[in-house]
């Protein structure tokens, strides 16, 4: 199964590279990263691949390129991936996935930087945010080629911490119980 990773990069999501770095040299993997990825290249890659992994910043309306704040993926692009297994790792991706009935593992609000933690009044420091980010991405990297339901189970079982408020918050936003 051919897999496409789309990651509109910016410094605040560099930690996400853990998810796909080890797969960069595989023949059945395509990785699109950077800023301002042309939509023609994205659409062509969406058609040519069987599984799609979206990574970065976003809203319930889709995946953003934080540089320039333009949407890279929206409901207008569903025709290219609606019937494919997808992973949507961006803030409130679960709303997007549920609204469009996708076969997806999708994150809810996902605190990955200090400003987001402050917005949600989470008492934390950068070390705990980094620990949360790394834990989540390492687990997702190990199961990213699985069925979305199995990814959800693996994340729910592995992405835990009794002492990290960021992990606890992110788990709650994904609908996991402790």
Enumerate the predicted regions with their spans:
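A domain-level signal for caspase-like cysteine endopeptidase catalytic cores
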Residues: 1-55, 87-89
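Solvent-exposed loop/turn segments at secondary-structure junctions
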Residues: 10-11, 37, 58-61, 92-96, ...
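Extracytoplasmic/secreted cell-surface and envelope-processing proteins
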Residues: 13-15, 61-69, 95-99, 114-116
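Mature extracellular/periplasmic domains of secretome proteins
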Residues: 47, 77-79, 97-100
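Short glycine/serine/threonine-biased micro-segments
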Residues: 54-56, 66, 106
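A short, glycine/acidic-enriched catalytic loop
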Residues: 59-82
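A short helix->loop->beta-strand "cap" motif at the edges of active sites that frequently abuts
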Residues: 81-85, 102
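Active-site-proximal C-terminal subdomain of hydrolase catalytic domains
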Residues: 93-178
């Amino acid at each position: 199964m051919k897999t496409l990773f789309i990651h509109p990069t910016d410094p605040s999501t560099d930690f996400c590279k853990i998810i796909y770095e080890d797969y960069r040299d595989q023949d059945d993997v395509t990785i699109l990263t950077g800023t301002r990825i042309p939509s023609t290249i994205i659409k062509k890659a969406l058609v040519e691949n069987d599984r799609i992994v979206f990574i970065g910043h976003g809203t319930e309306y889709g995946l953003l390129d934080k540089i320039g704040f333009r949407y890279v993926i929206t409901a207008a692009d569903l025709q290219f991936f609606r019937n494919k297994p997808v992973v949507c790792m961006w803030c409130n991706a679960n709303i997007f996935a549920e609204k469009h009935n996708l076969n997806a593992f999708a994150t809810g609000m996902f605190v990955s930087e200090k400003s987001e933690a402050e917005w949600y009044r989470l008492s934390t420091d950068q070390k705990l945010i980094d620990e949360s980010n790394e834990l989540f991405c390492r687990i997702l990297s190990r199961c990213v080629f699985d069925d979305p339901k199995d990814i959800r189970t693996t994340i729910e079982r592995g992405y835990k911490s009794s002492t990290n408020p960021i992990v606890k918050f992110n788990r709650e936003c994904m609908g996991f119980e402790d």
